[in-house]
Design a protein with these regions (language model features):
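A short alpha-helical cap/connector motif
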Residues: 1-159, 164-185, 192-238
Length: 238
């Protein structure tokens, strides 16, 4: 009930940039997160979601980690605005997270999607093989091993996504801290899943170089751009 009331309040009073005095955040909310313009990529993302449903009959694990239409679309819009070229995803949302974040371009970027579940890794590979327009490599290994390798390979990734990492979120955030630069976009899914996840989210917002952060109920977004206000803004995007 508490989560529902929080979402309802945000939906009624925190949309359309109401009460936001930062030009950067106002533009982000009104022209990216809440944009209603249609994109060709939306058709491809819809087809990918249907492909998942048909292929797996939405088995519990796939259904639980899959993304909604709204989630796919705003992730696409976010990537389309900030154009990340080196993307690391810890968890793949059954392949929909890398697909959504890379569909803005047909080349010139590289994504690494990490999975520590063999079934989810295979689901993501199959989906991306059929639908991805940019190269995304799916790696199957424990996150504690695969994430440091991916971070060292990219050096300073443009986008890091942590997808509902139960129990290990704080440790993985600490692992990422030394690789974040001012243009890095940090996206965390499941910040309201548990008290531990919410505490880890607050830790990310408190990184020394963190500036604007968006608490969107289920998802969190952190920017590290100098000159922006060091503040967390409440919103809801899905």
């Amino acid at each position: 009930m508490k989560r529902f009331l929080k979402r309802l309040y945000r939906y009624l009073f925190c949309r359309k940039g109401y009460g936001v005095h930062s030009p950067f955040v106002f533009d982000l909310i009104t022209n990216v997160l809440e944009e209603r313009h249609g994109y060709y990529a939306y058709t491809e993302l819809k087809a990918a979601r249907l492909m998942l449903q048909d292929a797996a009959k939405m088995k519990n694990a796939v259904k639980r980690q899959s993304l909604s239409r709204h989630e796919c679309e705003w992730l696409f819009r976010l990537a389309n605005r900030f154009k990340p070229c080196r993307i690391i995803m810890v968890g793949s949302g059954a392949g929909l997270i890398p697909l959504s974040l890379t569909s803005y371009a047909s080349g010139g970027l590289h994504g690494i999607a990490l999975e520590q579940d063999a079934v989810m890794a295979n689901v993501a590979r199959s989906l991306l093989r059929e639908r991805a327009t940019s190269p995304v490599e799916v790696r199957y290994e424990t996150y504690e091993v695969s994430l440091p390798k991916a971070l060292a390979e990219f050096g300073h990734p443009d986008c890091i996504v942590l997808d509902e990492i139960t129990g290990a979120l704080s440790a993985l955030l600490r692992c990422c801290a030394g690789y974040i630069h001012e243009d890095t976009l940090l996206i965390v899914r499941g910040i309201d899943a548990s008290p531990e996840a919410n505490e880890a989210w607050r830790t990310a917002c408190a990184f020394p170089s963190a500036t604007v952060s968006i608490d969107a109920c289920t998802w969190g977004i952190v920017f590290f751009r100098p000159g922006l206000p060091r503040k967390t803004f409440g919103h809801v995007v899905c």
